[in-house]
């Protein structure tokens, strides 16, 4: 069972609609999270809260204006997650120029922003102070080796986020 106050999020990359529906029926996640080439219609078809991930710096999303224009179509999303661009899908462990988010943040339809991409205990404070995201997402930045998380690195990461967030 999932503990109280924890949301279940189902992450998909270019899923078959039947697979998404099966997860909705069998798991009942609070949120769907789309990381592929899903259109706004693909994301909204389930009538369920969703997060949309964007790969900042991808072809066609390499300027602040282009990124904001693309994001605008996903105005129904519960939040927008920004990761760095890599040729494949999934986290690359690399950061991106956070200046690309300037137009996104200023857009009237902007959604809660989740920052991802190359975040570590050493750089997350500067990223939080610069971007002021609603949340941060980390994976490889707290690993001691691929797939192995360090409880110390996680603690340092969380402490850095709290310290940066307190400096409003």
Where are these regions (language model features)?
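Conserved active-site loop/cleft motifs that coordinate metal ions or position small ligands
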Residues: 114-116, 135-139
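Acidic, divalent-metal-coordinating active-site segment for phosphoryl/phosphodiester hydrolysis
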Residues: 120-124
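Active-site-proximal flexible loops/turns
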Residues: 90, 104, 125, 144, ...
